[in-house]
Amino acid sequence: MYSRYSAYNYSPHLGKTYVYDNKYYKNLGHVIKNAKRKHDALEREADERELDHLDKYLVAEDPFMGPGKNQKLTLFKEIRNVKPDTMKLIVNWNGKEFLRETWTRFMEDSFPIVNDQEVMDVFLVVNMRPTRPNRCFRFLAQHALRCDPEYVPHDVIRIVEPSYVGTNNEYRISLAKKGGGCPVMNLHAEYTTSFESFIDKVIWYNFYKPIVYVGTDSAEEEEILLEVSLVFKIKEFAPDAPLYTGPAY
């Protein structure tokens, strides 16, 4: 009688059952990832211990909101018409933009910077508002800081990768050069002697000259009220109250 278990058709797997318990088997990728995770956690703990002593200092994420006093100097207020899909040049210190009557609009004796203070930063602030009610669009802006002195910008450009203006329709640019502020003293005397000399020799010697374009994402021509101003971030050597247990600045 033929037997299915004869030597001719014998298989070593017949009659045997293998049961693998995953409790004792680990995926190789899981083992490597787990080891790397533990190694990264140990490195992170060591880094945090080294940085613990910095917890007593405060740093402002937005330099505009950081320590110091903001002093605003309005340059001009104007109404500009902006056509769809275009941006209009509103600030150009390389050309004749500010060599006109707007200089005299804010020249006064009550300049806020006095001798015992220094300029930490200068911000160009452009505030935009629609002149017509019930308009639904967003403001766009672009700027450049490192233009060649001989560069002549166009009055109108096409919209290419602009940035949307944030809260309060205010576009704010820090004009500080790399390395920080402007340790210039006796600013009030420089200002009262010659305002144009103050701008050229004091401000633009330590800060960048900006070129700014503004526009809208509207499909129609829009009328915009612009208020352009310089905001000086003033360092106070004797602050009224310290920010924290560490140094104030």
Curated annotation (Swiss-Prot):
Disulfide bonds: none
GO cellular component labels: viral occlusion body
Domain of life assignment: Viruses
UniProt keyword list: Viral occlusion body
Coiled coil (UniProt feature): none
Cross-referenced InterPro entries: Polyhedrin
GO molecular function: structural molecule activity
The protein's role, per its UniProt record: Major component of the virus occlusion bodies, which are large proteinaceous structures (polyhedra), that protect the virus from the outside environment for extended periods until they are ingested by insect larvae.
Family: Belongs to the polyhedrin family.
Record-given protein name: Polyhedrin
Organism the protein comes from: Spodoptera littoralis nuclear polyhedrosis virus
Lineage, top ranks: Viruses, Viruses incertae sedis, Naldaviricetes, Lefavirales, Baculoviridae
UniProt gene name: PH
